Amino acid sequence: MATSLTPADPLQEAAIVLFSGGQDSATCLAWALSRFGRVETVGFDYGQRHAVELACRARLRDGMAALDPDWATRLGQDHTLALDALGTVSDTALTRDAAITMNENGLPSTFVPGRNLIFLTFAAALAARRGARHIVGGMCETDYSGYPDCRDDTIKAMQVALNLGMASRYVLHTPLMWIDKAETWRMAEGLGGADLVELINRESHSCYLGVRDVMHPWGHGCGTCPACMLRRAGWERYVADGADA
């Protein structure tokens, strides 16, 4: 999200990254580490079926710190917040043992109403305590499942609401908003080379069903849920583009 609030030297600034342990948030963490002087991460345990993603976070953080000494210096504290209530009030295929289907409203049954709105609110509250002005999220409306809380208009509205409601000057960054999954892999390569791509491929998690014991060329997963299909298609385009270059 473009803004005039970003200082000339963001290395003097701190950022909070919404960090689930997935491909998108891992790429966003690398993006933030390349730009801000102190970067902290926050993950949310809301009763998701794919809670295995939370276990991936530490390995990704450690791996990124090992890739670049500057990143190691900038990488700050990790936070995990329990949001059990979100899982309690949500009757979705991400928080219940239910089949993934398409609802009558055109949204997949994996949509958790209000999830990103709640995540951003808690991230802003944490940022206030930790002295961070920048909040980074992996929301995207290019290669995505149609979730309304991933849209650019939603993020812009949340930035306004958070700043009004907290009398602050937060800047919400969504570096993946207008790129697809293939371009997300390409961004990771640009940020940290083939080593970062390999780290994200091997250690991040996208599968909605939490399948971790099956490894594909594009990463772990069941291979059939919407998240796996998006990740696989993006990887295949990324590899094909590389082969054509």
Swiss-Prot record:
EC numbers on record:
6.3.4.20
Task: Provide the alphabetized UniProt keywords.
Answer: ATP-binding, Ligase, Metal-binding, Nucleotide-binding, Queuosine biosynthesis, Zinc
**Annotated InterPro entries:** QueC, Rossmann-like_a/b/a_fold
Q: Which Pfam families match?
A: QueC
- Catalysed reaction(s)? 7-carboxy-7-deazaguanine + NH4(+) + ATP = 7-cyano-7-deazaguanine + ADP + phosphate + H2O + H(+)
The record's top EC class is ligase
One term of GO molecular function? zinc ion binding
Q: What is this protein called?
A: 7-cyano-7-deazaguanine synthase
Q: Source species, please?
A: Gluconacetobacter diazotrophicus (strain ATCC 49037 / DSM 5601 / CCUG 37298 / CIP 103539 / LMG 7603 / PAl5)
